[in-house]
Amino acid sequence: MLMPRRPRNPRTVRIRIRVRGVVQGVGFRPFVYRLARELGLAGWVRNDGAGVDIEAQGSAAALVELRERLRRDAPPLARVDEIGEERCAAQVDADGFAILESSRSDAAVHTAIGHDTAVCPDCLAELFDPANRRYRYAFINCTQCGPRYTLTWALPYDRATTSMAPFPQCRPCLDEYNAPEHRRFHAEPNACPDCGPSLALLNAQGMPVEDVDPIAETVARLQRGEIVAIKGLGGFHLACDAHNADAVARLRSRKQREEKPFAVMVANLATAAQWGDIGSGEAALLTASERPIVLLRKRSGVDGRFAGVAPGLVWLGVMLPYTPLQYLLFHEAAGRPEGLGWLAQPQSLVLVMTSANPGGEPLVTGNDEAAQRLTGIADAFLLHDREILVRCDDSVVRGDGEPAPHVQFIRRARGYTPRAIKLARSGPSVLALGGSFKNTVCLTRGDEAFVSQHVGDLGNAATCEALIEAVAHLQRVLEIRPQLVAHDLHPDFFSTRHAAELAAQWGVPAVAVQHHHAHIAAVLAEHGSDEPAIGLALDGVGLGDDGQAWGGELLLVDGGACKRLGHLRELPLPGGDRAAREPWRMAAAALHAMGRGEEIEGRFPRQPGAPMVNRMLAQRLNAPLSSSMGRWFDAAAGLLGTRETMAYEGQAAMLLEGLAESWGEQPSPGRPKTVAHSLGGVPRSGGGTYKALALPDAWRIDAGNTLDLLPLLEALSAETNAARGAAQFHATLVAALEAWTVATVQVTGVRTVVFGGGCFLNHILARNLCRRLAARGLTVLTARQLPPNDGGIALGQVWVALQRAPN
């Protein structure tokens, strides 16, 4: 629409403004249009590969206000990083303000795709309004909600570069799209039942289920105990009724996921509060537009109601609906109530929602792929015809009982990717390919690092192919050819081999970064720190500079340099990698180190391999040494009888953490009266406290700065109460690590300590050690924007490569 013609004014000024950041797909052009109209400005706004370009003409005062409000009043999903400005010649006949077609210049891309967001309250109100033309339409969205990253092929962000391109808008949708006063003004995924994507339900044989409402029939099947594959934003879920133990057991059997915990989806906070402890931080996370899976401390009775969902664990993964389709499932189960009132009330439907990634392969995204890979698992398929362009799992986080800044990522993916992490310096573009487990990749542009969504474990060809796809997608949307390629030291990782191939193909240097150096560097990178730091890297395994298996390290990290200052006592791994899956083997290794190898067979009578393991240890055959902290957790679990073998990675440590938490709730008779340390009164996310006492004289630090926890395991070997032993293990470990770190700080004079590695996913360890060291006056940096585990090391590899790059 044209503005009324204004009189020409010799004091009229025209400027060109370039806005950089997350400014495409978030309603930024409509926002600029409305703002310019309000201020009486003439000109135009358009997307280009670098962000948003604006030419505006009017009074100097109006232009000053425009610049100020571009930042101050930007749409909620936008992020304005930079505003550039230059003067232009005023146009004599300038009149009106318009949104122009997007431009593709030869300039480098400087914008980013927005992240996928949960359906907004305005769209929900329409979704449940029988008088609205989008009533119960599973693809409702607007400029403030809906898919972005997972349906975008390239920039600039226009319908033609998304998977909505095959769906031309009908006249009513076009009218909304072109109406400046409408919240769907230039909403690229805009659609309705007449012109947009649609649903279909298929049976187990892949044949359409005719003459049914797909939503109603899906809910009926779920309530009958069936398993339904449901197509979402970044891939398929496998869903079943969490209350139905038989359905959960069938899902475990068919997916071959024996004990690994499932997440559940509930309708709202009121329902979530029935099953988990929710503080202000958890509530904010559950209802955030990113809609991650949030780990909640289970309430009493959860395991009885949800048998087999998260067996033996203290935490339950919970998420709220984030797509209209998911909301419609709960709406149907509630009897199709009008309005939004029902969303404030507890609802009975609770769904297991697990990623459809059979065999540990990548998440299923396509309809044909689902029919091939999920046949025999799903009893039905709820599909739609909007293509998923970017595979993206649900994110998993844990709150800290406080508001949103205190968040620990366990998996960073949907909702947070591809949000950039600001670096403290610019440099050449670096591509880092991460490690072999929980893989992510990272690509830099100037002072921004773009970490991909979770790729997975590179133990199969399909996941390796997914890594290649992730690299290609980041390069395509950022239009960058890296000048350096970074990778892990391990020569047998696919990520390492592929990094070498890419470096050779592009004729650029390849930079090898030691695994634990990368863990610490990742945290330094996200905190923007260039200063030397003491790194405490605790995880399962990573190849060390000496070719040995590391995993319990004290490091001095100074830019691109890293020096090993100390490590945990090395334990043998009888049977090699098998010891990492069978905690009884690590317990046997500990017994042998105590000089009690003769007890191994009697201690583990159910393990037919016990005699052989005893011989391995005695003869030092197939028992490589490792300083891994993870293996000390396994040894403790094995000695306490918590777990002799594991069904999934980290299970023993997670069960041990749960036992320790449970001991904190019980009366304390029998606890030792003489203690070296106490972790009493530490707040928990659910509002209770965790209390445990450290054992005295339960560790040693030798002249070479090796921390020996064998005395702790000796004490645990005689413990008859597993929960008490687990609590003592955690409390003593925190005390030992505190003493070890403080002694190293005193020697080096470096007073910044950085935590890195998967062991810091342990809530008790991470929170209490952080508090202890902070009380000593030390600065403690922890992972906040990425997981502390291998999901973050690609960023660390990037940071080290940048530090080593010539200025």
Swiss-Prot record:
Keywords for the protein's UniProt record, in alphabetical order: Ligase, Metal-binding, Plasmid, Zinc, Zinc-finger
Region described as Disordered: spans on this chain: 663-682
Keyword Cell cycle applies: no
Domain YrdC-like: 212-415
Origin: domain of life: Bacteria
Pfam (any one): Sua5_yciO_yrdC
One Gene Ontology term from the biological process aspect of the record: protein maturation
Keyword Endoplasmic reticulum in annotation: no
Top EC class, one word: ligase
Protein family: Belongs to the carbamoyltransferase HypF family.
Free-text function comment from the UniProt entry: Involved in the maturation of [NiFe] hydrogenases. Along with HypE, it catalyzes the synthesis of the CN ligands of the active site iron of [NiFe]-hydrogenases. HypF functions as a carbamoyl transferase using carbamoylphosphate as a substrate and transferring the carboxamido moiety in an ATP-dependent reaction to the thiolate of the C-terminal cysteine of HypE yielding a protein-S-carboxamide.
Protein name (database record): Carbamoyltransferase HypF2
Organism: Cupriavidus necator (strain ATCC 17699 / DSM 428 / KCTC 22496 / NCIMB 10442 / H16 / Stanier 337) (Ralstonia eutropha)
Taxon lineage: Bacteria, Pseudomonadati, Pseudomonadota, Betaproteobacteria, Burkholderiales
Gene name linked to the record: hypF2
